[in-house]
Amino acid sequence: MTMTSKKRKALTAAGWRVGEAADFLRLTAEERQLVELRLTLALAIRRQRQASGLSQKQLGERLGTTQPRVAKIEVGAPDVSLDQLVRAYTAAGGRIECQPPRSPATGKASRLKVAL
């Protein structure tokens, strides 16, 4: 969730320091990307499960796990691995498409495109 610019200005004017959680936690660029990927997958799993008309219990049965574990998967809990997130998304009926960069690395950062 992002803060509105109006609220950000009001907090700054009141003397508060406003920033992102990643700044506060001093996450590296790689750690930020990992957190973003985990949260994106977790949100996609919940949306896909709901769109497929599945309960958390039903998705858990497909995965061979419990409803409480599915709840942890859907919030991207730290003890949930990336492969568990991917398995949950596909078990809910989702499909992941990866598109590698078009050309080899040229010293510049390249982007791997992932469509959920």
Per-region residue spans from a language model:
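N-terminal flexible/basic segments that precede or flank functional cores
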Residues: 1-40, 103-116
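Short alpha-helical DNA-recognition segment
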Residues: 53-72
